[in-house]
C-alpha cells in the first residue's frame, strides 16, 4: 500500500491506481467529503517532457501516484519516484550533478533540535542532499518561535520535529523521514545515531550537546553545528579523526551530568567558552548580559539561521561526496561582509569598442627592396597569428626560418608552422615578382637551429601572374563574420583548383549543403574538445587579444571574431579554466559547438588543400598553395576563414593522444568521419581547411610584430 521507507513516520501515504489495496484506500478517501483531491499530474508530466537531455521513455510511462496528507485532509496526484525526483531536482544541475545527486541520496542525516534545525533539515531536503532524515526534538512550537521557525499559527502547540517532517513531506513525499518526538537522552542517543552518516546538532541542552558528541565520536560520525551569531559553523570530523576532543577541546574534560538542568543564565559561561566571547557580535555579547534580566531566552534572527542552513548544507554535500572538509570552525559573517562593500569595477571591454571598424589597407612600402619583400612575407597568416618564423633579409636573399619556440599542442610535429612558412614564402615570391627580383626558392630541413628553412635568392624574375597578386596579397585578411551562403561560380571553382595545382597541391571544394552540414558537425565537435582540453584551452585563450591588452601585434584581436556583446560575455566566461574544467568533468559543453557549427553551415563552400607527402617541405608547399587560393578567392569576392580542427595535422592516434589525451578516441573518430566525407586519398595530407562565404569586410585586421633585422647565425 505504501512505499517502504518512503514517507517515513509522518503518516503520509503514497498510493497508486494499479495496486488493488491502494485502490481500496483511494476509494475510501474519495468517499469522504471532507477530503479534497488535487490532480495536476498533466502539468508535472509536461515538466518531464521538458527535461534536457530528453528523458528515457520509461520515465514518461511511470504510473501516477497519489500522496495522502492526513493533516491537510488532501490527496495530491504526483509523478512516480524517478520522474518526481528528476523534475523536482532538475534545477540543481549542474550545481549538483545527477551523479552527485544519486550519491547524496544514499546519505543518512540526523538533526537534533528543530528550531534552527528546521531550516537546515528543510534545506537538505530541498537540495536532495540526503536520502534519509532523522529528526529529534521533544519541544513544541510556541508563538515566540515564529520569529525564526518557518511555521504558522496553526502549528502552535505541535511538536517541532513533527512540523518539520510535515513540511518536508509536502516538499518530497518520497523522502524517508524518521521522527524522535521524545527528544534525546543518554539512554536513546546510541539508537538515534545508529546508521547515520552525519549528525547536525542544534539543541539548547548543553548536556545533550556533550553526550551526543561523545557518542558520535565513539561511532565515528561527524557532527556539524551552526550558531546564528556571525554565521559560526563548527565541523567535527570524528569519522576521519577518531578520538578528537569534543568541541575542539574548548570545554576541557567536562562532565555532562553537571550540565544537566542548568538555567539559561547558568549556561552562559559554558556557551561563551564554546563560542569565544571575543568573537561574538556586540549585540549578541551584550544580550548575554541581559539573559534573565530583560531577556528570557537566546535572541536569534531568521536570516542568520538560514545563512547557517546554507553553510551546513554545503558541509553535508562535501562529506557525502568525499570532498575536502577539515575539522574546525568558520564564520560566514553577512554583517561584516556588508561593511566591506566595494564599487564594482567598470567593464574594461564595454560595448563601444564593438562599433569600431578598421578596414584593411595596403601599407606604405618601406625600402630597400629586400625589406619590401620581408614585410610582405610577415603578412602571411599563421595559426593563432603566432607568426612562427624568423625572417632574415639580406641584399641578395631572403630566409624564413621556422621558429620552434612558437609551436603549440595543435602544431603537431611543426606541420602547422611549416604551412605558415610556406605561406610567408609565397607572399615573398609575389612581392619579389612585383619588384622584378624574383629568384629561385629552396627548402632545407637539415639546419640544427630550425626544423625548416626557406630561402629565396633574389634574381631578375617578374612572373606576371604572381606580380598581379601583389596588391590583393597586401589586402588579404581573415574574415570571421557569420556570413551568408551563396553560389560559387563554376569558373571560380576551376580557377581556385588550378591555383592550388600551380603550387603543387590539390584543392577540394565541398559545395553541396549536405556535405557542408556534415563537415560543420564534425568541425564543431572538434572545437568543443579544444575548449575542454586544458592545454589546448590555455593556448587558445593566450592567443586572444582584448582591447587594453599591452600587445596587439600578435595573436587574434577579439574584435576580429565578429561576436556580438552577448557572445563576447560568454567568451569572457570561457576564458576561465575552472569553468571549462567543470564542463569537461560533466561531459557537457555542447553549446561550445554552436559558433563553429553555425558559421560553417553558413558557408558557400568548404575548401580543403592537400599535399601528397608528409615532410615539412611538403607542408610548406601546401602553405604556398593555401595562401595562393586564399588571395585569389578573396580577389573574386569570397570571404575566407580558416578552420583548424585538432586532428588537422595528426597522422595517427599517437599524435591525438599527445594533443588531447582524454578525448583522443573521440578525435580519432571525428578524423575518420571527416576523411570519410572528403576522401583525401591514401597519400593526401590536409594542409588547411577554410570556409568560403559572402560577408562584409572584417571589423579589424590582425597585426604583425615589428620586424627587426636578425643576424645570420654562426656556422
UniProtKB/Swiss-Prot annotation:
InterPro entries: Nitroreductase-like, ThiF/MoeB/HesA, ThiF_NAD_FAD-bd, Ubiquitin-activating_enz
Superkingdom of source: Bacteria
GO BP terms in the entry: cyclic threonylcarbamoyladenosine biosynthetic process
Cellular compartments per GO CC: plasma membrane
Pfam families, sorted: ThiF (PF00899)
GO molecular function: oxidoreductase activity; tRNA threonylcarbamoyladenosine dehydratase; ubiquitin-like modifier activating enzyme activity
PANTHER family according to UniProt: THIF PROTEIN, TRNA THREONYLCARBAMOYLADENOSINE DEHYDRATASE
Protein name: Uncharacterized protein Rv1355c
Lineage, broadest ranks: Bacteria, Bacillati, Actinomycetota, Actinomycetes, Mycobacteriales
